[in-house]
Structure formats: C-alpha cells, structure tokens
C-alpha cells in the first residue's frame, strides 16, 4: 500500500496529522503486505522524517520510491529500506507519468544501484512493459521490475476498449521478465475496477496501490478499503490461466 496521499492530506494544511506511521499500522492490521512511500525531491507529501520513522518502527517491509539522484542514494544508504524503486521524476508532474528509460542510461544506473545492492537493499525499476527496458533492467543487476500500469488504467477508466490490447502487452512483458529471473511487480492508477485484470497475470507477484485505496478510505475507512482491494485481487487470482 502506497501511503503518499495520507501525507498529501497532511500537507494541505501544514499540520502534523494525519500521520503516515499510523496509516502504516492500519495497513498491517488490514492485511497489507508492505508499505511504499515516495520521497520526492520537492518533499510535496512524504518527508525525510516519515521515511526514517517507517523504517525505525519496521511495521511492514518498506519500499522507498525515489529519483535517481545523489541525495536520494545517500538517504537510501542511511535509512536502509527493504527495497528501493527507482522512478523518473519531474517537479511539474502531479504524479509519476511514465517509466524509467533504463536502456538509455545503462552505465549511470548500474553505477547508481551498485552501492545500494551492496547494502542488501533490493532494487526495483519502474518501467514501461517493453522487452527493451526489461533487458536493460536485467543487464544492470536489478532484482525487480515494476510494470507501469497507468496507460492501461486510463483507458479502462475511460471505457476505451483498447485497454484489452494493453493488458496483453503487460502480460507478455511480465512473462518475459519472469523468464529472465526478474521478480515482477506492477502499479500506477489501479482501482478496484481495474486491479483484477492485472491480478490475473500469474507472473506478477506484487501490486503497489495507493491513490485508489486512500480515496476509498474517505468513505469506508482505510482498513475497509484495503480489505476490499485485497479481496478483488484474491478473486482475480482464482481465475488465473
């Protein structure tokens, strides 16, 4: 469960609440498997103290989303999260808009992740469902890829039937990465409506979902929103090919 938007609500008024740490505890109680938090360069929601406290309390495994910068590398090496997920980042974007271009940055990314891996932190790369990017991720020593599901979700939410072809592309990419020995995750834009399509893909081990869960929690509580999302995932996995 991505808890960024708990911090977004906090930042709207500049208060000390709601506390992402309390959210993490509820995530665990509701059956969540881990916590994802994106420490952006502009600190627009999650801040350094949140990351430190989440790791110190060790409520659930911590996946730190971050840009490929010297500052973020230092923070990861200091905090020692269970995993880092490297994402592209632009200050003007509302949320991450696309996957990391690994194939164009092989040398620099390999150098960037080397000290992180030496600290036994698992490295994930947020990428588009492309064999070219998957090959590049494998070549630099990534442990995990997270497939960007945003385009699929946009089509699905707008009732555009082209989402069916995009799902096929995601499934093909997941199978390809799995055969290469990469662990496969997926995320971005998933809702209770769209999550089933991704959950049916056998090779995808983990889903990172945040905005939809936090949105639903306004009406049904955070625990209830997590439980419903998990149920949707479980139902879809029963019908895997």
Where do the language-model regions lie?
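Hydrophobic faces of well-ordered beta-strands that scaffold small-molecule active sites
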Residues: 1-3, 35-37, 62-66, 84-86, ...
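Conserved N-terminal beta1-alpha1 strand-loop-helix module at the mouth
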Residues: 2-64, 74-81, 136-139, 162-165
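Active-site mouth loops of central-metabolism enzymes
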Residues: 2-20, 61-68, 95-103, 120-129, ...
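Surface-exposed amphipathic alpha-helices with a cationic face
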Residues: 28, 52-56, 110-120, 138, ...
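C-terminal helical cap(s) of enzyme catalytic domains, especially alpha/beta-barrels
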Residues: 55, 98, 157-163, 216-238
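Catalytic cores of alpha/beta
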Residues: 70-79, 130-140, 186, 190-204
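Glycine-rich phosphate-binding active-site loops on the catalytic face of alpha/beta enzymes
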Residues: 85-93, 144-157, 203-222
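Histidine/lysine/aspartate-rich catalytic loop segments that bind and position anionic ligands
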Residues: 122-176
